[in-house]
């Protein structure tokens, strides 16, 4: 396990910061930086070795990050969550992600004439990070920053499909699915089947479970290494063609865009 080397600037900063320097904050930021493309999940011992800090200090830091929602754990391995993006503020959200995804969903909306969105998983919800609609109103609720239940939305189900069975069972055992419409699936066994189907099929289609009269289809967006980073969907009023039409006409467009964007994801 390679160690995370401190830059010369970091060393000088710590040495010359003076009495107001917060060592605990510095340790916390260093623990966050232990995770990268090659180290997406780490054990407590792995983190301690990489940052060269005592296990007790790293344990407290990781516990705090999990408690605040910036990290997640299965009891042994730790990983960062999308909430870490908040640490970088608007710059990271608007420039690193939306600068790629927002023009892409706008282009797809112009091509298919339906609403298109992108989202990331945050806990039990998805957060919409890019959205475009045609001139007509599709959904009064759709907007960047909107949170939706992951288990009920097409954007969320393709993200949950990337979880292993143990992680999925833990999530389904924890949540209390809300009955958003008369069509919303709340039975945990049915939700498990729907998410596993999304895993097998490579897409999820949700019919009026989040909003009455609104149907959507989604695919995962992957990094170059194959890991899922976000999801893309197309949504339309249920009177604008059926589910089969979505699969035959819109799904190929979504998959083509996801394949194109994969080359830009790091």
Which sequence ranges carry the predicted segments?
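Juxtadomain coupling helices with adjacent low-complexity linkers
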Residues: 2, 228-266
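N-terminal helix-turn-helix
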Residues: 2-99, 259-264
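Short, solvent-exposed recognition segments
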Residues: 2-11, 137-210
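Amphipathic alpha-helical effector-binding/dimerization core
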Residues: 77-175
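Short loop/turn motifs at secondary-structure junctions and domain boundaries
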Residues: 110-111, 208-213
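Short hydrophobic beta-strand micro-motif common in sensory/regulatory domains
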Residues: 215-219
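Sensor-regulatory modules in signal-transduction proteins
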Residues: 221-224
């Amino acid at each position: 396990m390679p160690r995370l080397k401190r830059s010369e600037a970091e060393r000088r900063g710590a040495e010359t910061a003076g009495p107001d320097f917060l060592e605990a904050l510095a340790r916390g930021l260093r623990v966050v930086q232990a995770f990268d493309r090659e180290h997406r999940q780490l054990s407590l011992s792995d983190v301690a070795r990489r940052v060269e800090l005592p296990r007790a200090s790293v344990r407290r830091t990781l516990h705090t990050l999990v408690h605040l929602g910036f990290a997640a754990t299965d009891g042994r391995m730790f990983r960062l969550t999308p909430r870490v993006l908040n640490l970088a503020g608007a710059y990271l959200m608007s420039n690193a992600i939306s600068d790629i995804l927002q023009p892409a969903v706008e282009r797809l909306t112009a091509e298919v004439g339906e609403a298109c969105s992108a989202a990331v998983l945050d806990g039990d919800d998805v957060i919409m990070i890019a959205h475009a609609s045609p001139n007509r109103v599709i959904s009064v609720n759709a907007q960047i920053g909107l949170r939706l239940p992951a288990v009920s939305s097409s954007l969320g189900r393709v993200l949950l499909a990337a979880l292993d069975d143990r992680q999925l069972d833990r999530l389904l055992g924890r949540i209390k699915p809300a009955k958003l419409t008369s069509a919303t699936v709340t039975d945990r066994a049915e939700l498990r089947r729907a998410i596993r189907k999304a895993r097998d099929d490579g897409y999820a289609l949700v019919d009026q479970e989040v909003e009455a009269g609104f149907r959507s289809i989604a695919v995962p967006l992957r990094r170059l290494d194959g890991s899922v980073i976000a999801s893309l969907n197309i949504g339309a009023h249920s009177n604008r063609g059926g589910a089969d039409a979505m699969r035959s006409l819109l799904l190929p467009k979504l998959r083509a865009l996801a394949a194109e964007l994969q080359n830009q994801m790091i």
